[in-house]
């Protein structure tokens, strides 16, 4: 009997995961689970490079466009819901594919969410006050002192992530990293991790061209349609936050587009830093489809 296997296809933004994920899913006649924390939102299609209606017809997808912008959602909820969906899918398929670039969501399924302490209201209020009065840069500098390892990989432009890490440091006297690296949970399926990578110059060129394509497809109009919700964490996202600066009158449009490209490149580097720590990932160029399928066939028990 073939063991249940979860293929995890990961890689930085713009590397070429989408088309290859479709081809792998079609080869194994299975479904795709998205691990992109922004593709969850129905209003965010162009800026998240969400699967198109045609792609959704080719392969059944889960966790794409299922939330509204105002819905609260966490990696812990994602873990619970994906594990439930996987239990159902493995009754129909011996292989399921999970793909995306949201590092915490991938880890939530492969390793499980760590038992991070609940933050008390006093600590949260203290740090929110510091954020309001001192700004994000000062909090980032403090995080660098208290937890230099997490500082290297966290999105320093995301106040929610920075503040949460500091909350744990304040409350426990330990690093946030120490709670994130505990023993991983056992899963009732085999996990095979495929990483996609490209030469940096090649990847950066693809990212730049993809941003231009998003603008041609209507990213400005999409960002304008959600502008009223711009304070939500779900919109503290590359591609939207830069256009909000344009809509606020702070930047001109050409500058905003260049900042989207720059911030996308920075994000891709952070993704690779995170993924490269994982020795279970087998790395390929996206055009090595034949080699990837051969490796998967040989590895599925």
From Swiss-Prot:
GO terms for molecular function: ATP binding; tRNA dimethylallyltransferase activity. One of its GO terms (biological process) is tRNA modification. Keywords: ATP-binding, Magnesium, Nucleotide-binding, Transferase, tRNA processing. It catalyses: adenosine(37) in tRNA + dimethylallyl diphosphate = N(6)-dimethylallyladenosine(37) in tRNA + diphosphate. It comes from the Bacteria. The keyword Magnesium applies. Substrate binds at residues 13-18. Its EC number is 2.5.1.75. It holds the Pfam family IPPT. ATP binds at residues 11-18. SUPFAM superfamilies: P-loop containing nucleoside triphosphate hydrolases (SSF52540). Residues 36-39 are annotated as: Interaction with substrate tRNA. The record marks 102, 124 as: Interaction with substrate tRNA. Catalyzes the transfer of a dimethylallyl group onto the adenine at position 37 in tRNAs that read codons beginning with uridine, leading to the formation of N6-(dimethylallyl)adenosine (i(6)A). Monomer. This is tRNA dimethylallyltransferase 1. It comes from Bacteroides fragilis (strain YCH46). The lineage of its organism: Bacteria, Pseudomonadati, Bacteroidota, Bacteroidia, Bacteroidales. The gene is miaA1.
């Amino acid at each position: 009997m073939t063991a249940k296997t979860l293929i995890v296809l990961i890689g930085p933004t713009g590397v070429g995961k989408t088309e290859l994920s479709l081809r792998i899913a079609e080869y194994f006649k299975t479904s795709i689970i998205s691990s992109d924390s922004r593709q969850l939102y129905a209003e965010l299609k162009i800026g998240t490079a969400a699967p198109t209606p045609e792609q959704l017809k080719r392969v059944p997808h889960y966790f794409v466009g299922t939330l509204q912008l105002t819905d609260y959602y966490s990696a812990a909820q994602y873990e619970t819901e994906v594990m439930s969906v996987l239990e159902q899918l493995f009754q129909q398929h011996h292989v399921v594919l999970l793909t995306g670039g949201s590092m915490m969501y991938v880890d939530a399924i492969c390793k499980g969410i760590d038992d991070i302490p609940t933050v008390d209201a006093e600590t949260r209020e203290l740090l929110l006050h510091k954020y309001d009065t001192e700004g994000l840069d000062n909090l980032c500098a403090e995080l660098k002192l208290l937890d230099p390892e997490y500082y290297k990989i966290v999105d320093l432009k995301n106040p929610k992530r920075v503040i949460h890490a500091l909350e744990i440091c304040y409350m426990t006297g330990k690093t946030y990293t120490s709670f994130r690296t505990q023993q991983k949970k056992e899963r009732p399926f085999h996990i095979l991790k495929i990483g996609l990578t490209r030469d940096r110059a090649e990847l950066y060129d693809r990212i730049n061209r993809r941003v231009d394509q998003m603008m041609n497809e209507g990213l400005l109009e999409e960002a304008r349609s959600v502008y009223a919700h711009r304070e939500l964490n779900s919109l503290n996202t590359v591609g939207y936050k830069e256009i909000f600066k344009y809509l606020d009158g702070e930047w001109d449009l050409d500058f905003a587009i260049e900042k989207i490209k720059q911030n996308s490149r920075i994000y891709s580097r952070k993704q690779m830093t995170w993924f490269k720590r994982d020795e279970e990932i087998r790395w390929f160029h996206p055009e090595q489809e034949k080699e990837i399928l051969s490796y998967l066939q040989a590895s599925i028990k």
